[in-house]
Regions:
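Exposed, interaction-prone extracellular/peripheral surfaces
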Residues: 8-13, 22, 31-67, 74-267
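N-terminal low-complexity, intrinsically disordered segments
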Residues: 16-26
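Sequence-level motif detector for i,i+2 pairs with an aromatic at +2
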Residues: 1, 15-17, 189
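Intrinsically disordered, low-complexity, positively charged segments
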Residues: 1-7
Length: 267
């Protein structure tokens, strides 16, 4: 049984569950309510950092990540699961302890809105925040939880693998790589100005060598993240900003649900 809340005493309540501290403070009898712990916590790690503030189709990656996380959180709420996790944008983060129903859902949705990038976000130097965030999540999560990671996973350092392994060792982890189609394949032949908020460059996709290197760079990144997930038993999905979020998640999570021992939340 898990503690849920305190409310005013009602006839028929078990006197053994009286909250004497609140009763003494308010001068009126109060009792503790408990609920049977049927479902495990569902936690989210949502990346809204500088590299996620990019998009050429439909929406920025950060917006698609928030949409996907919100859909999964609503499904978890409808399933009776507790919702929590970490929403981070570079070195800033908001940590939310798992809570049931609206007490978990609403603060999480608010964090997804509040942490969205505004204006031009300069690229950050260093990637130690990834190590710190994964370490925080691995320390906070209770064994047996369902964990969703939503990010483009750019800047994920090798040092983060230890925390990732710790997280995946005793939890069901689903990693969702968010990307824009222009990241996966170079746009039509031409010269395109690029900027990360600090530096400027021109991409010449008319050069076949450049176009091939561009495509291979994304494929190598995607394959490296997939390999990391597979090494530690984490399910891996990709979600393009041009894809319908509910249908893409549903297809990917149905495959995950069929794996032996896997249980997940489907929107």
């Amino acid at each position: 049984m898990e503690f849920e809340e305190v409310r005013a005493y009602q006839p028929g309540d078990d006197i053994r569950n009286m909250d004497w501290r609140v009763t003494a403070r308010t001068g009126r009898p109060h009792t503790k309510l408990f609920q049977e712990e049927r479902e495990r916590p569902v936690l989210f790690l949502v990346d809204l950092g500088p590299s996620m503030a990019f998009g050429t189709r439909v929406a920025f990656k950060s917006v698609v990540a928030a949409r996907a996380a919100a859909l999964l959180a609503w499904a978890a709420r409808d399933n009776g699961d507790r919702i929590g996790g970490i929403v981070f944008a570079g070195k800033r983060h908001r940590e939310l302890r798992p809570a049931a129903r609206e007490r978990g859902l609403l603060p999480f949705l608010k964090a997804l809105v509040d942490m969205q990038p505004t204006g031009i976000m300069p690229a950050e130097t260093g990637n130690g925040h990834w190590v710190d965030i994964l370490r925080r999540l691995a320390s906070a999560v209770r064994p047996g939880s369902l964990v969703f990671l939503l990010s483009d996973f750019h800047g994920l350092p090798h040092q983060a693998e230890q925390s990732f392994a710790r997280l995946a060792a005793h939890n069901d982890v689903v990693s969702i790589l968010i990307f824009d189609p222009v990241e996966a394949a170079a746009p039509p032949a031409g010269r395109y100005p690029l900027s990360d908020g600090q530096r400027f460059a021109v991409l010449d996709t008319g050069d076949p060598t450049v176009a091939d290197a561009y495509r291979n760079r994304f494929a190598s990144h995607r394959d490296a993240v997939r390999a990391l997930c597979h090494r530690h038993g984490s399910h891996f999905l990709t979600l393009a900003t041009s894809q319908p979020v509910p249908e893409t998640l549903r297809r990917g999570l149905i495959v995950h649900h069929r794996r032996p021992g896997a249980r997940t939340t489907r929107p």
